[in-house]
Amino acid sequence: MKSITVEKLMKDLNMEELNSIEATALLISTTDLNRPGMQLAGFFDYFAYERIQIIGKVEHRYLETLDTKTRKERLDRMMSYDIPCLIISRGLEVPEELLCTANKYQRKILRSHKNTTKLISKVINYLEDTLAPTITLHGVLMDIYGVGVLITGKSGIGKSETAVELIKRGHLLVADDAVEIKRIGHEVLQGCAPEIIRHMIEVRGIGILDVKSLFGVGAIKIKTDIDLIIDLEEWDSTKSYDRLGLDDNHREILGMKIDEVTIPIKPARNIALIIEVAARNHRQKKMGYHAAQEFNDRLMKSLEEKSQQ
């Protein structure tokens, strides 16, 4: 399971550290957060101590209503659990008992000036991105008519050359050769280029090209969701290719199924144009219209009418 240090979280989200506990060894391994209202009330059954703890205005005000002895006992018990860190929102003052118990058990206390809702949203989004399962695949990733298209195929089949033609047609390059893919939450696969080759594309016979310099910033995109996979393969006369489009094929990446279309490569076929059409067709399907199914329905209706004559 992936994890990050509390120190990295603190630096990346510009949080204020309120005690000097070493944060490099404190690890965060879940994207979920916990507001410990029940624990401050003395109920510790099912305490999600492995999560980041968030103290907002409600929890802070509740602590103020407790007498010193009770407040210290509740905080002492909460901090005795192995929590990764505790974050106080809205720039609220830190109760002295909280700092004392945090130092006693070596727990990191951070503070943010954002309101609690925005803080929780920001931390969850950050953790989902940082802790997301990741894989690197060989291919080209582009944004075509707003559809994230991952073009795959064996080396030398023409993926990069096709990408250049698509860029000339106004589409956006995300990554060439190596595509870093993250699973964000349960429904999204997001792809980007490794930092070292970002905006670059390799064309055999020419070399490395800087797409941003050659075509402008309007030809690139940092990252995109992956909606469709186009697999390029050499034409095989012994193989039967789908000519109607009724069969939906998928490829599984990081546990998610992504729609896949196989395009056979043959001289005189305009692959860039075919990929554009595939992207448009995919978008049309997602909007509820399936051309192949419509054709099949018409055909079946025609056959039924003829059989009744």
From Swiss-Prot:
The keyword Nucleotide-binding applies. Its cofactor is Mg(2+). InterPro entries: HPr(Ser)_kin/Pase (IPR003755), Hpr_kin/Pase_C (IPR011104), Hpr_kin/Pase_Hpr_N (IPR011126), P-loop_NTPase (IPR027417), Ser_kin/Pase_Hpr-like_N_sf (IPR028979). Signal peptide: none annotated. Residues 201-210 are annotated as: Important for the catalytic mechanism of both phosphorylation and dephosphorylation. Mg(2+) binds at residues 160, 202. One of its GO terms (biological process) is regulation of carbohydrate metabolic process. Its EC number is 2.7.11.-, 2.7.4.-. Gene3D superfamilies: HprK N-terminal domain-like, P-loop containing nucleotide triphosphate hydrolases. Keywords: ATP-binding, Carbohydrate metabolism, Kinase, Magnesium, Metal-binding, Multifunctional enzyme, Nucleotide-binding, Serine/threonine-protein kinase, Transferase. Residues 264-269 are annotated as: Important for the catalytic mechanism of dephosphorylation. It catalyses: [HPr protein]-L-serine + ATP = [HPr protein]-O-phospho-L-serine + ADP + H(+); [HPr protein]-O-phospho-L-serine + phosphate + H(+) = [HPr protein]-L-serine + diphosphate. The active site is at 138, 159, 177 (proton acceptor), 243. The keyword Coiled coil does not apply. GO terms for molecular function: ATP binding; magnesium ion binding; phosphorelay sensor kinase activity; protein serine/threonine kinase activity; protein serine/threonine/tyrosine kinase activity. It is an enzyme of class 2 (transferase). ATP binds at residues 153-160. Catalyzes the ATP- as well as the pyrophosphate-dependent phosphorylation of a specific serine residue in HPr, a phosphocarrier protein of the phosphoenolpyruvate-dependent sugar phosphotransferase system (PTS). HprK/P also catalyzes the pyrophosphate-producing, inorganic phosphate-dependent dephosphorylation (phosphorolysis) of seryl-phosphorylated HPr (P-Ser-HPr). The Walker A ATP-binding motif also binds Pi and PPi. Both phosphorylation and phosphorolysis are carried out by the same active site and suggest a common mechanism for both reactions. Homohexamer. PANTHER family: HPR KINASE_PHOSPHORYLASE (PTHR30305:SF1), PROTEIN YJDM-RELATED (PTHR30305). This is HPr kinase/phosphorylase. It comes from Alkaliphilus metalliredigens (strain QYMF). The lineage of its organism: Bacteria, Bacillati, Bacillota, Clostridia, Peptostreptococcales.
